[in-house]
């Protein structure tokens, strides 16, 4: 169920509120272009600045609009284990197919603390779980040995790995084998990860180029490695351009330039892109043929 290119979808806002109509339209754009899954309320979805009610509503909208056409993996992570359990229970009750849980941030747990955090959530909620390792945002790297321990838990089925290290990725796959699906959390590592046994990506770039990101995974998983490699190198400027500034400012700017969202409205403390980087991004989109 969890393989291919799954979009870490943005949460559009209008006058400070979740723009439900635009969000539904974005989901339809994704499914029409072959995206393999929808991942709402992640980093790209600005989960950190959604209220609990908004967070739950965005998941409900996603499940309703997708209507079982592709899997929905709902972001339900928190640095408070009990809050993560509450959000994950809601995702299950709403009909999500799985839950994506960022590692606890700010409180800097030990490896044992990380293990117990995910273990408790797994025991509390019977839904497929995808831990999310992104030490650049959490300040703690979940080490391969810890991930291998978590892979023994029945409903921990995959990991979104975004430590930026191919060594770590290969260590995880070597330790876990078929017990755990490894997904890239970084678009620019999608092809290298597939080459060492990973199964896909939870993608920011899929917001703006869903068909090509899905095709990259389809080609590779179908055995056409050379075509996949060529497409990867074509996508690479977008993989870099969407991170000229803190995600999701660039991807929202790109979607606005493409007329997929009415504006690139963000919630503080995130700010719009600088004019210089906005120009660079526009040039990338023009070169790719997206605008």
From Swiss-Prot:
Pathway given in the UniProt record: Amino-acid biosynthesis; L-lysine biosynthesis via DAP pathway; (S)-tetrahydrodipicolinate from L-aspartate: step 3/4
Database matches in Pfam families: DHDPS
InterPro entries reported for this sequence: Aldolase_TIM (IPR013785), DapA (IPR005263), DapA-like (IPR002220), Schiff_base-form_aldolases_AS (IPR020625), Schiff_base-form_aldolases_CS (IPR020624)
Catalytic activity field: L-aspartate 4-semialdehyde + pyruvate = (2S,4S)-4-hydroxy-2,3,4,5-tetrahydrodipicolinate + H2O + H(+)
Subcellular location as annotated: Cytoplasm
Residues marked Part of a proton relay during catalysis (site): 43, 106
Keywords: Amino-acid biosynthesis, Cytoplasm, Diaminopimelate biosynthesis, Lyase, Lysine biosynthesis, Schiff base
PROSITE patterns tied to this protein: DHDPS_1, DHDPS_2
EC number: 4.3.3.7
Residues reported to bind pyruvate: 44, 202
Oligomer status and interactors: Homotetramer; dimer of dimers.
NCBIfam families, per database record: dapA (TIGR00674)
Functional note: Catalyzes the condensation of (S)-aspartate-beta-semialdehyde [(S)-ASA] and pyruvate to 4-hydroxy-tetrahydrodipicolinate (HTPA).
Protein name: 4-hydroxy-tetrahydrodipicolinate synthase
Organism: Syntrophobacter fumaroxidans (strain DSM 10017 / MPOB)
């Amino acid at each position: 169920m969890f393989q291919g290119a799954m979009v870490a979808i943005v949460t559009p806002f209008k006058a400070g509120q979740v723009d439900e109509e635009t969000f539904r339209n974005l989901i339809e754009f994704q499914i029409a272009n072959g995206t393999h899954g929808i991942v709402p309320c992640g980093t790209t979805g600005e989960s950190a600045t959604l209220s609990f009610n908004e967070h739950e509503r965005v998941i409900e909208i996603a499940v309703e609009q997708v209507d079982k056409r592709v899997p929905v993996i709902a972001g339900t992570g928190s640095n408070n284990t009990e809050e993560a359990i509450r959000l994950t229970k809601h995702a299950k009750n709403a009909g999500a197919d799985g839950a994506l849980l960022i590692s606890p941030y700010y409180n800097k747990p030990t490896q044992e603390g990380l293990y117990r955090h995910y273990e408790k959530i797994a025991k509390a909620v019977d839904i497929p779980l995808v831990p999310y390792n992104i030490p650049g945002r959490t300040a703690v790297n979940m080490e391969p040995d810890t991930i291998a321990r978590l892979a023994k838990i029945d409903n921990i089925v995959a990991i979104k790995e975004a430590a930026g290290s191919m060594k770590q990725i290969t260590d995880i796959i070597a330790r876990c084998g078929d017990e755990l699906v490894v997904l890239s959390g970084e678009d620019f590592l999608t092809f290298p990860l597939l080459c060492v046994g990973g199964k896909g990506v939870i993608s920011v770039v899929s917001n703006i180029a869903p068909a090509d990101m899905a095709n990259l995974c389809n080609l590779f998983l179908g055995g056409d490695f050379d075509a996949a490699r060529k497409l990867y190198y074509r996508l690479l400027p977008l993989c870099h351009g969407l991170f000229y500034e803190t995600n999701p400012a660039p991807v929202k700017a790109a979607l606005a330039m493409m007329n997929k969202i009415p504006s690139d409205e963000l919630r503080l403390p995130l700010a719009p892109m600088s004019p210089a980087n906005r120009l660079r991004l526009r040039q990338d989109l023009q070169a790719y043929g997206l605008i």
